[in-house]
Amino acid sequence: MKILITGCCGFIGFNFANFLAKSNKKIRIIGIDNLNDYYSINLKRKRLKELNKNKNFIFYKIDINQYEKLKKLYKKYLFNYVFHFAAQAGVRYSLINPKAYIEN
């Protein structure tokens, strides 16, 4: 079984991906994240380092708005399930840059 998790370095995506990876080693988990700097890049890197300890986890640095890259990923893995946790964080930022939220 192949599962795509978007936003895998965010709080919810990380915890979900880590739980799945540890609970069933037969599942192949593909995680994507754009690793934007809205909040701590170091925190995201720590989470990614933790996820990479799981042999059934693979990471791609992809923004969900990069349609062609996503299309290639879908063709490569033919996912059974997609869990979409990618989102632009921060309510206040939405007042300054609403386009970032619309595109996401």
Features from the language model and the residues they span:
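N-terminal Rossmann-like NAD(P)+-binding domain of SDR-like oxidoreductases, especially those catalyzing
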Residues: 1-104
